Amino acid sequence: MKFFAVLALCIVGAIASPLTADEASLVQSSWKAVSHNEVDILAAVFAAYPDIQAKFPQFAGKDLASIKDTGAFATHATRIVSFLSEVIALSGNASNAAAVEGLLNKLGSDHKARGVSAAQFGEFRTALVSYLSNHVSWGDNVAAAWNKALDNTMAVAVAHL
């Protein structure tokens, strides 16, 4: 999983300040509403932050419109969204905290080896939140749940960069 497993960074919430059951439910239900849009999610991130696209050797330097409809793009987008879905499914249950932490530790370590910066994790977060807020029912409660989840996720993953 490349940089977009970073999406996983955008989702959890198990470590520093665990998500409550209600917060986890908000994150999970909003994610479920868009998780079938793998290609669109990844394309939105690349469109907002071309420096993130440049971290993917198979997509670097290519026009987004020319790669968006390719099998390679769809495969990679699905890989990223599947990882995020796993992390999100585990969130909100204290007995899963170690599993979530392990996934995020590995995410940070893997991305350190690829030269991904904390700033790029922040960019990914911004693009993901923008995508979500435009494609799901987005109120203050949903925004707060996602922000808490992403704060927790970033704290763990970025610590390993």
From Swiss-Prot:
<comment type="subunit">
    <text>Homodimer.</text>
</comment>
<dbReference type="GO" id="GO:0019825">
    <property type="term" value="F:oxygen binding"/>
</dbReference>
<feature type="binding site" description="distal binding residue">
    <location>
        <position position="76"/>
    </location>
    <ligand>
        <name>heme b</name>
    </ligand>
</feature>
<feature type="domain" description="Globin">
    <location>
        <begin position="18"/>
        <end position="161"/>
    </location>
</feature>
<keyword id="KW-0349">Heme</keyword>
<dbReference type="GO" id="GO:0005344">
    <property type="term" value="F:oxygen carrier activity"/>
</dbReference>
<dbReference type="InterPro" id="IPR044399">
    <property type="entry name" value="Mb-like_M"/>
</dbReference>
<keyword id="KW-0813">Transport</keyword>
<dbReference type="GO" id="GO:0005576">
    <property type="term" value="C:extracellular region"/>
</dbReference>
<dbReference type="GO" id="GO:0020037">
    <property type="term" value="F:heme binding"/>
</dbReference>
<dbReference type="Pfam" id="PF00042">
    <property type="entry name" value="Globin"/>
</dbReference>
<keyword id="KW-0479">Metal-binding</keyword>
<feature type="binding site" description="proximal binding residue">
    <location>
        <position position="111"/>
    </location>
    <ligand>
        <name>heme b</name>
    </ligand>
</feature>
<keyword id="KW-0408">Iron</keyword>
<dbReference type="GO" id="GO:0005833">
    <property type="term" value="C:hemoglobin complex"/>
</dbReference>
<dbReference type="InterPro" id="IPR009050">
    <property type="entry name" value="Globin-like_sf"/>
</dbReference>
<dbReference type="GO" id="GO:0046872">
    <property type="term" value="F:metal ion binding"/>
</dbReference>
<dbReference type="InterPro" id="IPR012292">
    <property type="entry name" value="Globin/Proto"/>
</dbReference>
<comment type="similarity">
    <text>Belongs to the globin family.</text>
</comment>
<keyword id="KW-0732">Signal</keyword>
<dbReference type="InterPro" id="IPR002336">
    <property type="entry name" value="Erythrocruorin"/>
</dbReference>
<protein>
    <recommendedName>
        <fullName>Globin CTT-VIIB-4</fullName>
    </recommendedName>
</protein>
<dbReference type="InterPro" id="IPR000971">
    <property type="entry name" value="Globin"/>
</dbReference>
<feature type="signal peptide">
    <location>
        <begin position="1"/>
        <end position="16"/>
    </location>
</feature>
<keyword id="KW-0561">Oxygen transport</keyword>
